[in-house]
């Protein structure tokens, strides 16, 4: 929690941003599902592109997993494609003050990335929204 999410105000001013939410207690998957279900689309996520602090894997290997991970998965796992244990732990991990999840139209990607770079943010896409399919969220 080094900085506030004030950049969200700038993101919201871009016409290419179609949805945005902070990633908190329902974790990345829960908030992504809210966007998908509210917009009647699905998402395909490249798990290897989801940012994660390096030391988190050590904690997972030690079995230090928040109880909220399982509760989150129980509440929305039926709408998610198959996940291994590590994917489930990372993608269902409840956050107190997570980052922003932003949906950007493909034609606006350059403008979005320029705004990010101008604000010292090095962001990359983690997936894409697609015509609604089942499951609502799937991983590559």
Q: Where are the regions that the model predicts?
A:
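Glycine-/charge-enriched secondary-structure boundary and capping motifs
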Residues: 13-140
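Active-site glycine-rich loop that binds ribose-phosphate moieties when present
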Residues: 1-12
């Amino acid at each position: 929690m080094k900085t506030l999410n004030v950049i969200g105000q700038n993101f919201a001013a871009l016409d290419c941003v179609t949805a945005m939410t902070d990633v908190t207690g329902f974790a990345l998957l829960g908030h992504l599902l809210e966007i998908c279900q509210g917009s009647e689309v699905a998402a395909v996520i490249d798990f290897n592109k989801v940012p994660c602090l390096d030391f988190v894997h050590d904690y997972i290997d030690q079995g230090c997993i928040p109880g909220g991970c399982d509760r989150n998965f129980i509440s929305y796992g039926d709408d998610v494609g198959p996940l291994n244990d590590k994917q489930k732990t990372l993608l269902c991990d409840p956050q107190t003050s997570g980052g922003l999840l932003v949906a950007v139209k493909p034609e606006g990607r350059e403008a979005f990335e320029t705004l990010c770079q101008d604000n010292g943010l090095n962001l990359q896409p983690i997936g894409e929204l697609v015509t609604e399919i089942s499951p609502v969220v799937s991983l590559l």
